[in-house]
C-alpha cells in the first residue's frame, strides 16, 4: 500500500538519521543522572530518581520528536523531494497521512524506549500507563510539528511554534490559577484577563493531565481518568490532522 510505503520511508529516515543512537545516549545519560541522585539524596532517593528521570525523559522525548519531524519535512520541501512525491499518483491526503503515520510510529518507538529504564524504579503497571500516555503525547506533538513544519517557512519558527504550543498547554492550569488569584483586586481589567486566559485554555489540549510523574510515584490513575486523558489527546490530534490536511491541500509547494 502507498501509505505503508511512506511509513517505512519515515522510519528508515529516522534510523539513518541516528534517532535510535540519540535515544540510547539519552537513556544512558538519564540512568547516569539517576545513579548520581542516589548518591546525593539523603531520603526518598528512589522517589527522587524516578521523578527527575521521568520528567527529563518526557521533555526530551517531546523536543526530539518535534525537531526530527520539522527537520525532516523542511528538508523534503527545501530539496524539492516533496514536489517529486506529489507528482506520483497519490492523493495529498495519502501523502500527508502516510508521513504523519511514519512520524507517529517513530514517536511511539521512542516513547517505548524511554519508558523501559523507568522499570528500575517504578512498578510495571505505572510505567506502562506512563509510556502509553507519552506515546499519545508525542504522537500529538508529531502532528503539531508536521503542521507547523509545512505551514511556516523555516525550521526555527516552526520549532518555536511547536515548543510554545506545547509549553503553553502544559502550563495553562498554572496560568489560570494565577489569573484567578483571590489576592488580586477585582477590576474590569482583571475580569477581562481571567476571561481571556480561560478562552485560550479552551483551545488547547489538556497536556497537564497527561504523562504525570505522580503515576510513577503513587501508582496508575483510575481507568476512567486515564481513558479521559487519552481520549482528549487523540481527539485533539484529529483536529490538528484536519487542520494540517486543509492547509496541505490548499498550499502550492
Per-region residue spans from a language model:
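Aromatic- and glycine-rich beta-strand/loop motifs that create alpha-glucan
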Residues: 1-24
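Membrane-interface capping segments at transmembrane-helix boundaries
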Residues: 17, 245-253
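Residues that define the loop-to-transmembrane-helix transition and helix capping
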Residues: 21, 83, 93, 155-156
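Central hydrophobic cores of alpha-helical transmembrane segments
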Residues: 24-28, 157-169
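Secretory targeting signals
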Residues: 28-72, 96-158, 177, 223
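Helix-loop-helix units of permease transmembrane domains in multi-pass membrane transporters
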Residues: 71-102
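Terminal transmembrane helical anchor/hairpin motif
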Residues: 163-247
Amino acid at each position: 500500500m502507498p501509505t505503508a510505503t511512506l511509513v517505512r520511508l519515515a522510519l528508515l529516515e529516522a534510523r539513518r538519521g541516528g534517532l535510535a543512537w540519540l535515544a540510547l545516549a539519552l537513556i544512558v545519560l538519564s540512568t547516569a543522572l539517576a545513579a548520581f541522585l542516589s548518591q546525593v539524596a539523603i531520603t526518598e532517593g528512589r522517589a527522587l530518581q524516578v521523578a527527575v528521570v521521568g520528567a527529563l525523559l518526557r521533555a526530551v522525548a517531546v523536543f526530539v520528536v518535534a525537531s526530527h519531524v520539522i527537520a525532516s519535512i523542511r528538508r523534503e520541501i527545501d530539496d524539492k523531494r516533496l514536489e517529486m512525491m506529489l507528482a506520483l499518483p497519490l492523493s495529498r491526503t495519502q501523502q500527508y497521512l502516510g508521513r504523519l503515520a511514519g512520524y507517529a510510529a517513530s514517536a511511539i518507538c521512542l516513547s517505548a524506549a524511554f519508558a523501559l529504564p523507568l522499570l528500575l524504579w517504578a512498578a510495571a503497571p505505572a510505567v506502562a500507563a506512563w509510556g502509553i500516555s507519552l506515546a499519545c503525547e508525542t504522537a500529538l506533538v508529531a502532528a503539531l510539528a508536521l503542521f507547523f513544519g509545512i505551514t511556516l517557512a523555516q525550521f526555527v519558527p516552526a520549532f518555536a511554534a511547536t515548543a510554545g504550543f506545547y509549553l503553553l498547554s502544559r502550563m495553562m492550569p498554572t496560568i489560570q490559577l494565577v489569573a484567578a488569584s483571590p489576592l488580586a483586586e477585582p477590576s474590569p481589567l482583571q475580569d477581562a484577563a481571567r476571561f481571556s486566559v480561560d478562552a485560550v485554555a479552551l483551545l488547547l489540549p489538556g497536556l497537564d493531565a497527561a504523562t504525570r510523574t505522580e503515576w510513577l510515584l503513587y501508582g496508575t490513575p483510575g481507568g476512567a481518568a486515564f481513558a479521559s486523558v487519552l481520549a482528549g489527546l487523540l481527539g485533539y490530534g484529529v483536529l490538528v490532522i484536519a487542520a494540517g490536511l486543509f492547509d496541505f491541500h490548499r498550499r502550492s509547494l
